[in-house]
Regions:
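Conserved phosphate-binding/catalytic loops and adjacent sensor/switch elements of nucleotide-binding enzymes
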Residues: 3, 8-74, 87
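Generic structural signal for small/hydrophobic residues in well-ordered secondary structure
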Residues: 36-38, 83, 113, 146, ...
Length: 190
């Protein structure tokens, strides 16, 4: 189900010069890490060649891959977005995520959009100082937000009506938008 994460990130990145997206798809083989290495090859040829030399990423070479990726240097700004990362997370060793989070700051920005980080959740949470998180509570709309959106759309909602919209939508922006487009009618969310 779409909760508005991708839309929120897409809007936030409007005007950013170089943004490249990878979208994971359920029930299809994950190629996100291979795509990531190819994108790095556009920015840091040396790292690309070093990663190519270790071939397919697995547990036996994850520490080596982490050391290589920790040395990545990107001069010009580039943002790589991994959408639906929950479909790829199991294929990314924790040491790789850790190395990427601890890299020296440069032009490389990584965004992982996921409904669930699975076994990588503790790895991401341990990086709290070096990783920016948008959690559910950061995306959910409040009654005041919903009343404000309704006013922008020329509607007038009472606090009770806004409460009903939250009850029916969970406060997720995409669902709230659809509800307001239907004059505040709400159905049950799956």
């Amino acid at each position: 189900m779409g909760y508005g994460k991708t839309t929120a990130v897409s809007h936030a990145l409007e005007g950013v010069e170089t943004v490249r997206w990878y979208t994971g798809v359920e029930h299809l083989p994950d190629t996100s890490f291979y795509w990531f290495i190819q994108q790095l090859g556009n920015e840091d040829e040396r790292t690309f060649r070093r990663m190519e030399s270790i071939s397919f990423l697995n547990r036996s070479n994850a520490a080596q891959a982490a050391r290589i990726l920790g040395d990545v240097r990107v001069e010009r700004p580039v943002t790589l977005v991994f959408d639906n990362f929950q479909f790829a997370a199991d294929n990314w060793p924790p040491q790789v995520i850790d190395a990427l989070a601890k890299r020296a700051e440069d032009g490389l920005h990584l965004i992982f959009i996921a409904q669930n980080l699975g076994r990588l959740r503790p790895v991401f949470e341990a990086q709290e100082g070096g990783v920016c998180f948008l959690r559910e509570k950061d995306l959910l709309l409040t009654q005041e937000d919903i009343c404000g959106l309704a006013r922008q759309g020329g509607m007038s909602l009472t606090r009770q009506q806004a409460k009903e919209v939250i009850r029916g939508t969970g406060g997720w922006p995409a669902a709230v938008s659809l509800s307001l487009a239907a004059d505040g009618e709400v159905g049950e969310m799956d």
